């Protein structure tokens, strides 16, 4: 399987018309780094990002740097979200009822606070243009048991535990480089032996919130090295030619 990361960007589950030069190559190289860094935690689908290892068609210059040769997997229909800091839709929910995705959190937290422990908040994996739905861990078990009656709970527990372990390892490393990983999303699949394997992209600005450690101050929103700028611009410019009336604007997960 060949996975190609394009220079396009999406927001609110819609692909925008503008492109960002070399975005696909940067995201591919970031995923490559993190896949190699975490291969001792969970196996992943990456085989190679070298053009010489690709089928002839993908050896073309336009695919150089932004393509990954991967093991083909049966993907699990759960997006594995982990939050180490309270922000975005999690902060909005906490202000309303003191919970994030049904998980009760300590009183007195302020926006961008670090959580006592990372929390796992899975969601459904919607089709493009539809919206993912936050679900409880037990609901994720139900979803997987419908597909894998004898293994659903085992798979749900594994992807939860892998998600937390991956986040802790990577967040600790990122801090040494001056970066806070506020939250991120992982996806998993099954190989031919029925083993859980990490797939898709990993810890890119498309799937994560990255904040600079320098200047981090709880109690307010943080500058970010991700596509939050795009989301903010879209919400601030409802009269732009992106036809935002057709896009359901809500806080990102």
Locate predicted features:
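Coil-to-beta-strand transition motifs
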Residues: 1, 75-77, 178-181, 192-196
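Conserved ATP-binding subdomain of kinase catalytic cores across diverse folds
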Residues: 1-112
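Residues forming anionic-ligand binding surfaces in small-molecule and nucleic-acid pockets
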Residues: 4-14, 112-151, 234-245
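Conserved metal-phosphate-binding beta-hairpin within the catalytic cores
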Residues: 82, 181-202
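Phosphate-binding core of ATP-grasp and ATP-grasp-like enzymes
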Residues: 116-130, 167-180, 202-207
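A long amphipathic alpha-helix within ATP-dependent nucleotide-binding catalytic cores
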Residues: 146-182
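A translation/RNA-centric and nucleic-acid-associated enzymatic feature enriched
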Residues: 196-241
């Amino acid at each position: 399987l060949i996975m190609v990361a394009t220079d396009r960007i999406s927001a609110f589950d819609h692909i925008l018309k503008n492109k960002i030069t070399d975005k696909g190559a940067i995201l591919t190289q970031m995923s490559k780094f993190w896949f190699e860094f975490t291969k001792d935690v969970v196996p992943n689908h990456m085989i190679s990002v070298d053009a010489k290892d690709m089928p002839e068609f993908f050896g073309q210059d336009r695919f150089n740097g932004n393509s990954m040769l991967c093991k083909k997997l049966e993907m699990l229909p759960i997006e594995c979200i982990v939050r180490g800091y309270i922000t975005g839709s999690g902060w909005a929910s906490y202000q309303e009822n003191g919970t994030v995705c049904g998980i009760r959190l300590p009183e007195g937290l302020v926006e961008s606070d670090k959580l006592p422990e990372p929390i796992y908040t899975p969601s459904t994996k919607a089709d493009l243009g539809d919206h993912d739905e936050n679900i409880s861990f037990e609901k994720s078990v139900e979803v997987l048991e419908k597909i894998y009656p004898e293994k659903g709970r085992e798979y749900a527990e594994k992807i939860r535990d892998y998600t937390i372990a991956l986040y802790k390892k990577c967040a600790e490393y990122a801090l040494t480089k001056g970066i806070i990983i506020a939250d991120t999303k992982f996806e998993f699949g099954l190989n031919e032996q029925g083993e859980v394997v990490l797939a898709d992209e990993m810890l890119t600005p498309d799937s994560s919130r990255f904040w600079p450690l320098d200047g981090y101050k709880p109690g307010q929103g943080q500058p970010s090295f991700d596509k939050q700028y795009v989301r903010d611009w879209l919400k601030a410019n409802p009269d732009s030619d992106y036809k935002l009336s057709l896009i359901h604007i809500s806080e990102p997960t």
